[in-house]
A protein has these predicted regions:
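Short, surface-exposed alpha-helical segments at coil->helix boundaries
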Residues: 15-19, 59-66
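Glycine-rich, N-terminal phosphate-binding loop of Rossmann-like dinucleotide-binding domains
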Residues: 56
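Conserved active-site segments centered on acidic
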Residues: 2-39
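Short, well-ordered alpha-helices that flank and scaffold nucleotide-derived cofactor binding pockets
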Residues: 19, 23, 67, 94, ...
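Short acidic/histidine-rich motifs immediately flanking catalytic phosphotransfer sites
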Residues: 46-51
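Ser/Thr/Gly-rich flexible loops in soluble cytosolic domains mediating phosphotransfer, phosphorylation
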Residues: 3, 75-101
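Short acidic active-site motifs
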Residues: 38-44, 61
Length: 101
């Protein structure tokens, strides 16, 4: 099971994207645990996950969050703006899987 966490300004704007990612995972038979949180809770939700994704609106924090994630052995990157804006769960799931390796 892939444990993916999305972090944005308040944790609310990514809720629809989370649903679309879960639907995409179910369609391809991938087991996932995907939850969105506000970025100020990043440290509390880093342990035991496979990937951390940042919403574009907090992309300015990328270097800081990647440093924390790297220390925990977790890949972290900013969700591409187009996929985020279009709520393309399939593409964002593929992006996360590529980060995980």
């Amino acid at each position: 099971m892939l444990k993916i966490r999305l972090f944005c300004a308040a944790g609310m704007s990514t809720s629809l994207l989370v649903r679309k990612m879960i639907e995409a995972a179910e369609a391809e038979g991938t087991e996932v645990d995907i939850i969105a949180y506000p970025v100020n809770e990043f440290d509390q939700h880093l342990a035991g996950i496979d990937c951390a994704l940042l919403g574009p609106q907090v992309g300015y924090m990328k270097a800081q969050m990647q440093a924390k994630a790297q220390a925990a052995g977790v890949p972290c990157d900013v969700i591409p703006m187009t996929d985020y804006g279009m709520v393309n769960g399939k593409n964002v799931l593929a992006f996360a899987k590529k980060l995980i390796g």
